[in-house]
A protein has these predicted regions:
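Phosphate/dinucleotide-binding and metal-coordinating scaffold of catalytic cores
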Residues: 1-203
Length: 203
């Protein structure tokens, strides 16, 4: 994967601004002129809407801004992405923040997109959930596992946040998030989460 030098931040096909890295590997961001005239601040405390270049601090987001860090996979998504990269001969540790945002591209769950879009996920229909659940167990049980499940989970939306294995799938023209058990979850974790969701609706 060729290193990315600059990222365009997009919101509903509008250019919000551009990201680059300083020589100290700190994120530098600048709003586009058009966005300054008719847009809004995407991070009021860190990135108020005005002209000029903003330079991130080294902490707490490893030289990035929180609004972009939120767009990156964590937990399960990060595990799958890094395993996927390794299987394709790419050392995840060599990737910059810009490289990782390009891998999110247009497939993140938030409103922001990133170009160039180097994402490798794709919309797919209903699948064999039982087989995917077994693959998730194999992946979580071994740091060296290199089966087809790595590609399958990455293609089916490896970037959502959270610790548990999950995929996005389409069924009857609707998008669904399907979650699987983590290593130490009880067998009825799905039923428990469903009950909690019903309680949340009542609140």
């Amino acid at each position: 994967m060729n290193s990315i030098n600059q990222i365009e931040v997009i919101y509903h096909n509008r250019l919000v601004g551009r990201l680059a890295l300083t020589k100290d590997n700190l994120c530098a961001f600048e709003y586009s002129a058009e966005w300054q005239n008719s847009g809004f601040s995407i991070s009021p405390f860190e990135l108020p809407l005005r002209s000029g270049v903003f330079i991130a601090k080294s902490r707490p987001f490893d030289g990035g801004f929180g609004v972009f860090d939120d767009c990156l996979p964590d937990g399960w998504g990060l595990l799958i992405l890094d395993r996927y990269l390794q299987q394709n001969g790419i050392n995840p540790r060599t990737l910059s923040l810009l490289d990782r945002l390009a891998l999110v591209g247009s497939t993140g769950r938030g409103a922001l997109e990133f170009r160039p879009d180097k994402s490798v996920t794709s919309e797919q229909d209903y699948s064999d959930f039982e087989e995917l659940a077994l693959e998730a167990e194999r992946i979580l049980s071994s740091e060296d596992y290199a089966g087809k499940g790595i590609d399958e989970f990455q293609y089916r939306g490896g970037s959502p946040g959270g610790a548990r294995p999950k995929i996005f799938t389409r069924h009857e023209n609707k998008e669904w998030l399907v979650k699987f058990r983590a290593k130490h979850d009880p067998k009825n974790i799905g039923a428990l989460e469903y009950e909690y969701s019903l309680l949340a609706k009542k609140c």
